[in-house]
């Protein structure tokens, strides 16, 4: 099955503590989760690694979020949108369901 959300897509969070926030997808995991820039920040307690010259401490980083909790952001309508697939010139492309516009 083709992925409706891909890396570098701009998405909006639908549920949870970051509801309504927008960000760019950094990574899509095979477990049905995505990592979004600046969304779902968690504090990780990191041990120092002297061999790599990394200091220890509390590091803030993005955690994965379920792909069902995000929707692709349509800049033309400034709203969350759904994704469809169609064939154009023999290639399968994604499009916004609300206005039919092709996604990059």
From Swiss-Prot:
SUPFAM superfamilies: Translation proteins SH3-like domain. It comes from the Bacteria. Signal peptide: none annotated. The keyword Glycoprotein does not apply. One of its GO terms (cellular component) is ribonucleoprotein complex. GO terms for biological process: translation. It holds the Pfam family ribosomal_L24. GO terms for molecular function: rRNA binding; structural constituent of ribosome. Keywords: Ribonucleoprotein, Ribosomal protein, RNA-binding, rRNA-binding. CDD domains: KOW_RPL26. HAMAP family: Ribosomal_uL24_B. One of two assembly initiator proteins, it binds directly to the 5'-end of the 23S rRNA, where it nucleates assembly of the 50S subunit. One of the proteins that surrounds the polypeptide exit tunnel on the outside of the subunit. Part of the 50S ribosomal subunit. Belongs to the universal ribosomal protein uL24 family. This is Large ribosomal subunit protein uL24. The lineage of its organism: Bacteria, Pseudomonadati, Pseudomonadota, Gammaproteobacteria, Enterobacterales. The gene is rplX.
